[in-house]
From Swiss-Prot:
The gene is Sytl3. It is found in: Endomembrane system. One of its GO terms (molecular function) is neurexin family protein binding. One of its GO terms (biological process) is exocytosis. InterPro entries: C2_dom, C2_domain_sf, FYVE_2, Rab_BD, SYTL1-5_C2B, Znf_FYVE_PHD, Znf_RING/FYVE/PHD. This is Synaptotagmin-like protein 3.
Length: 607
């Protein structure tokens, strides 16, 4: 806030300096006003020059600036892009930067705005149209109403109404509170419905290409298929919301186009060494769905599980791919018992990976209890991970409004499967079973691989043990660990992770040295290349120590981080629930300690 300056409170010298500055400022302002006045007068003169007089006669075609006559073929003039007037060639000004031209009036008007600074006020008024306006009482009321509508939607429960405890005025006030609460709830429902419609519309616009390969690989027809992903995402949201109005508004969004749950990308046939089961029919490397977690969260219906499924399993060592040939099903249960309807399809997972990236699906067969698929689903799996994976083959019914019904499943531990046996590649019948509550805990789970490099750094000229005092040698060692990257991690539904690595070295005296890597966001196969350094350790201490490495997915909105997997090295190596990995981790730890000052590359299996 500006204050009035009293010159009498200053000394004479100070007063002279202030007055001198004020006079100079007044002179500068007057000079600037004179300069602006000359620029505007010159612009006005150009406009008057082009004005037509009633006392003179003009031809139909003439220059809008100098009033010269324009010809039919030569000197016809051109239309200015700024004012849309036709001007001759002498009344144009060419702009070098934009490689365009303007008439003299438009150019001078632009020049005046630049030199006087009027362009700044025009741009400010354009970006902030309400700036400088006087606030009215109506605007204040609207702002207060908007603030009230943003208050917490669910207020505390009001006390029970009692006539003896409140007068007529308190009744009216309480009634007003109830009306405000109902209004805020209506606003909440409207905003949630709008957001769900936007989500459904944006996801329905995604498309994927589907290429079909028949028996002859040369006959290939490619076409595009509309892809909808909104069914699963909104099913989860609608099940969580308990308001029927939200569900009604969403189901009315697009009832004519149910989403297609099958998204495939065909792959060429494999080598001729495969059995006839895998060489015939259509071959598919099924694409994953972005939102594939609704059925795994229990958002589905159950039917009486009956019937069998026929499929075959083959593993190609050259391409490191696991192929599941889905043949046919028989005697399935009805997905909708009242309508006597069944639209079955098959979905597979390689457990424990239940992410959308690890899901494969077949086409939907309409109105049949004995569907025939003849499709091959592929997974890229390293041979070392097969022993820790389980194949889950489940049959589902696609109902109206993308509602899923569980028809049965088969779970096969791949550790017990003989891939070298040729008879094991033949198609077999498996009875469908109900969904198990808990899977076997004694089967080790593979949650990916972590690539690291380790080195024990010892002094260049270590002293002899008899010359060194006890405990001094422990301060000379250094353990260096480089976390390179990870792969095959259980990703989120969108196929990404915000992952980081934690390291904990537990010494024999139960002292723990903890380190942490930076977070790599939105990467399914992160590559940290981050170094962990543990100082003040010796080889004798490390032989009795344990190094634990854990991979985490950073959560959002204050939630707890999700553990993706862990691996241990040292005397107590081996992850919990996986005793077979203990001997391998001890062997790798021994290699690091037995070769000091040398890097040792390791690939740790996360459990």
């Amino acid at each position: 806030m500006a204050h009035e300056v009293d010159l009498e409170s200053f000394k004479e010298l100070e007063r002279d300096i202030i007055l001198r500055v004020l006079y100079r400022d007044q002179t500068v302002q007057s000079t600037e006003e004179e300069r602006v006045r000359k620029l505007k007068s010159h612009l006005q003169h150009l406009r008057w020059k082009g004005a037509k007089s009633s006392s003179q006669e003009y031809k139909e075609k003439c220059c809008a600036r100098c009033q010269r006559a324009l010809g039919l073929l030569l000197n016809r003039g051109a239309v200015c892009q700024g004012c849309s007037h036709r001007v001759c060639s002498e009344c144009r000004v060419f702009l070098r930067r934009t490689r365009a031209w303007k008439c003299t009036v438009c150019f001078e008007d632009r020049n005046v705005k630049i030199k006087t600074g009027e362009w700044f006020f025009e741009e400010r008024a354009r970006k902030f149209p309400t700036a400088g306006r006087r606030e009215t009482a109506g605007a204040k009321l609207l702002q207060s109403y908007q603030r009230l509508s943003k208050i917490s939607v669910v207020p505390p429960t009001p006390p029970p109404f009692s006539e003896s405890q409140c007068s007529s005025s308190s009744r009216l006030q309480e009634l007003g509170h109830f009306r405000g609460f109902n209004k805020s709830v209506e606003n909440l429902f409207l905003s949630v419905t709008t957001q769900m419609r936007k989500l459904s519309k944006s996801q329905n616009d995604m498309t994927s290409e589907k290429h079909l390969l028949a028996m002859d690989p040369r006959q290939c027809v490619g076409h595009t298929e509309r892809r909808s992903q909104s069914d699963t995402a909104v099913n989860v949201t609608s099940r969580k919301a308990s308001t029927p109005d939200i569900l009604k508004a969403f189901h009315q969004e697009d009832p004519k186009h149910p989403p297609d749950p099958v998204l495939k990308q065909d792959t060429p046939p494999s080598s001729p060494t495969h059995s006839a089961v895998f060489s015939g029919g259509l071959r598919h490397g099924s694409l994953i769905s972005i939102n594939s977690t609704c059925t795994e969260m229990g958002n589905f219906d159950n039917a009486n599980v009956t019937g069998e499924i026929e499929f075959a399993i083959h593993y190609c060592v050259k391409s490191c791919s696991l192929e599941i040939c889905i043949k046919t099903c028989k005697n399935l249960a009805y997905g909708e018992e009242k309508k006597r309807k069944c639209n079955p399809y098959v979905k597979t997972y390689l457990l424990p990976d239940r992410s959308s990236q690890g899901k494969r699906k077949t086409r939907v067969q309409k109105n049949t209890l004995d569907p025939t698929f003849e499709e091959t689903l592929k997974y890229q799996v390293d041979p070392g991970q097969l022993m820790t994976r389980r194949l889950q083959v489940s049959v589902w019914h696609l109902g109206t409004l993308a509602r899923r019904v569980f028809l049965g499943e088969v779970i096969l531990p791949l550790a017990m499967w003989d891939f070298k046996d040729s008879t094991a590649q033949n198609a077999r019948w498996y009875p469908l079973r109900a969904k198990a509550e808990k899977y076997e805990e004694n089967i080790p789970q593979n949650n990916g691989e972590l690539a690291v490099r380790a080195k024990l750094v010892l002094p260049a000229g270590p002293r002899k043990p008899q010359e060194a005092q006890e405990g001094q040698l422990a301060l000379n060692g250094q353990l260096c660990l480089v976390v390179l990257g990870a792969k095959n991690l259980p990703v989120r539904s969108d196929g990404t992770l915000n992952s980081f690595v934690k390291g904990c070295l537990t010494l024999p005296n139960q002292q723990k040295l903890r380190v942490k890597s930076p977070v790599l966001k939105k990467q399914a196969c992160p590559q940290w290349k981050h170094s962990f350094v543990f100082n003040g350790v010796s080889s004798s201490q490390l032989r009795q120590s344990t190094l634990e490495l854990t991979v985490w997915d950073q959560a959002i909105f204050g939630m707890n981080d999700r553990l993706l997997g862990e691996a241990r090295l040292g005397s107590k190596g081996g992850a919990a629930g996986c005793p077979d990995s203990g001997s391998q981790s001890k062997l790798q730890w021994h290699r690091v300690l037995s070769s000091p000052n040398l890097w040792t590359d390791m690939t740790l299996v996360l459990h």
